[in-house]
Amino acid sequence: MPVSHPTVYEPLTEQGAISLAVRLGLFPEGTPLACREIGDGNLNLVFRVVDQQTKKGIIVKQALPYAKVVGESWPLTLKRAVIESNALRTFASYVPQYVPKVYYSDESLAITVMEDLSHLQIARKGLIEGKTYPLLSQHIGEFIAKTSFYTSDFGMNQQEKKQLAQSFVNPELCKITEDLVFTDPFFNHETNNFEDELRDDVEALWNDDKLHLEAAKLKRKFLTEGDALIHGDLHTGSIFASDEETKIIDPEFAFYGPFGFDIGQFFANLLLNALSRPEQQQEPLFAHIDKTWDVFSTVFSDLWRTHNVEPYAKTEGLLEDVLHHTFIDAIGFAGCEVIRRTIGLAHVADLDGIEDKEERLQAKRYALRLGRSLILQRETLSSTKEIRSLFAQTVLAATN
């Protein structure tokens, strides 16, 4: 895969993106090209370069040296562009059907040129609109299972795994997660962002020593358990989808982390969407949670039995222990994500987009209670069906 020679970093423009596409020969000579900046995230510029005749295009993504959501006062490493392109290539070696093709990367300019997925829709947007994406959980479960297994000590030579893990050391972006997911929402921190009407609920979390202990345990797992190469930010805004197709994007937070983290992030964002819906429209979200875990555990178990390089692989109870801890960790991580997406720095449109103010505030109160329950009760849950029950109990208790 071509990688450029060192150059001096400068932010890309629409004309610059067109010039790059021409230089790389990604379109036939003389093709009339148009370009538009389409990024709506916090950390990058994203350009779509399109053949005006065929409407076929490419995506040019460039990391910014700061977070757009804050500005230049929050500097960020450009190395994350290398992390992202390398993660996409690594994932593609196991599940090419679930990630965009990478055509080119430039380390100095922090640029990745990749497949255009504009025929698909960001899953969060579609779910908010009421779409169900029937294959979403099948695909996400398989993606997490295969990438987790094959990049772990069970799926590859342990020494090779250590070398691969070294290439994905990602301290700056891991710190964002450590702060925004596992720390700041649980304290009176300046990055938090919530409505005044929620202050009593939020201060209750800040003063909850039992919750703090469990959140600290989950943070420690994130800090210390390097099970496999994980996406690191697998929410529904990092997924393109249709009824037939799923593509995972934006793995710039990728690093060697706990098996359960990506699952927990995905669960949390499905639960947040469920909280935004009337009860009679929540079933597809719970079905996706069920299916994700079913597929993950089945595929991971099949790979364990057929491709495991660990001498202890056939030891009775080891697979079950790995899956058990992955599940309860995922539940806890989901709880942290639900809380942070409600009162932390980066919210989700699922809740913030609820038009009626009282309904929006109520949904956020439910989210805080649900997040707390997921964290505190994670070790008592043994199946995804029990997540449904916990969800119902949280909402029911809040209405009584």
Swiss-Prot record:
It is an enzyme of class 2 (transferase). Pathway: Amino-acid biosynthesis; L-methionine biosynthesis via salvage pathway; S-methyl-5-thio-alpha-D-ribose 1-phosphate from S-methyl-5'-thioadenosine (hydrolase route): step 2/2. Substrate binds at residues 233, 340. It comes from the Bacteria. InterPro entries: Aminoglycoside_PTrfase (IPR002575), Kinase-like_dom_sf (IPR011009), Methylthioribose_kinase (IPR009212). It catalyses: 5-(methylsulfanyl)-D-ribose + ATP = 5-(methylsulfanyl)-alpha-D-ribose 1-phosphate + ADP + H(+). ATP binds at residues 44, 61, 115-117, 250-252. Its EC number is 2.7.1.100. One of its GO terms (biological process) is L-methionine salvage from methylthioadenosine. Keywords: Amino-acid biosynthesis, ATP-binding, Kinase, Methionine biosynthesis, Nucleotide-binding, Transferase. Pfam families: APH. Belongs to the methylthioribose kinase family. Homodimer. Catalyzes the phosphorylation of methylthioribose into methylthioribose-1-phosphate. This is Methylthioribose kinase. It comes from Geobacillus sp. (strain WCH70). The lineage of its organism: Bacteria, Bacillati, Bacillota, Bacilli, Bacillales. The gene is mtnK.
